[in-house]
Amino acid sequence: RFGTTSEAIATANPGLNPSNLPIGSVITVPIGFYNGGSDVTYGRISYTWELLSLFIEGIKARYPFVQQSSVGESVLGRKLYCLTVGKGENTVLYNASHHANEWITTPVVLKYAENLAKKYAFGGSIGGYDAESIYNSGKIYFVPMVNPDGVDLVNGYFDADSTVYQAARDLAENYPAISFPDGWKANISGVDLNLNYPAGWEQAKEIKFAQGFTLPGPRDYVGPFALSEPESIAMADFTRQNNFRLTISYHTQGNVIYWKYLDYQPENSYEIGRRMADASGYALELTPSASGYAGYKDWFIQEWNRPGYTVECGSGVNPLPVSQFDEIYAANEPIMTIGAVESFV
């Protein structure tokens, strides 16, 4: 009747005894968007923070063992949601949408979280590895939307006559050559979050100021100082509070994996990156010098000397069309699986 199965109902209601239901019991029925048993459709529409919240609510209803939390809040007070899948001691962190017009990375990590939970619950493999083994060996933390205010700006959540939209447009006027709002990468205050971490921040400032990015705007403004923004502060604090063995930061575009920061060479970092590249078809490269400072990946490697990666998905001009989603996800499912498997051994 509801397009569901007894197995799905049992998974959504742990501890339920179908032969002994007290009167007044409330049962979660995960009605199907599983058309013919297929996965939940993640990559067909533009994302907003509100839509992300609904998808997370659905994941939690279908798989109560998935943990939900928040690592902090955005400038406008939106929660920076975090999902955790797994129960082992070792941990990894996958984040997406540091950059607003790279929002297609949000459903990529969200779908992986859902698929891992689904394969664990019902049996199966993900990225070529047994999902139950991954689940039992460690925890994967997902922060699917680091920059919700910026994503909402790009995807039309704010009315053109709203105060938020008008303020962003005023900042964009500092850079008339950049399309608005499509060219917006920054948070709603006009700071590029992936240039706001304390790893060569002064060098990043020198480079970007020389390129003309001296004021808040759609992209490439490094901020007044490192960790000046609530979103970057939240990510840094959350990282310090945990003991991540590996991190992946998702961006677009280029079909490339960046694995190094300066002369830091964390143990097995290149080898893991090579495996990710071989499995995905992406290139494994050094970060271009003009973009080689003050990113989350750079800071993580500098502080912990552990493998950290920036993965640039897809090809074309940001924001990438949703028509690329299936191809992007197919390439990155093995990347995320390899990151976990290599960190949990």
Region locations from a protein language model:
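Active-site/substrate-binding loop(s) of hydrolase catalytic cores
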Residues: 89, 103-258, 266
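Active-site-proximal beta-strand/loop segments in catalytic clefts of secreted hydrolases
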Residues: 12, 30-32, 71-73, 85, ...
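Alpha-helical scaffolding within the catalytic cores
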Residues: 77-80, 126-129, 291-298
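Metallocarboxypeptidase
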Residues: 182, 197-345
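Short glycine- and acidic-rich boundary segments immediately preceding or forming the N-terminal edge
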Residues: 8, 31-76
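Loop/turn elements at helix/coil->beta-strand transitions in domains of secreted/extracellular proteins
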Residues: 64-67, 78-80, 88-91, 136-141, ...
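Extracellular LysM carbohydrate-binding repeats and other cell-envelope/extracellular binding modules
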Residues: 5-37
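Stable alpha-helical elements in mature extracytoplasmic
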Residues: 2-5, 20, 48, 52-55, ...
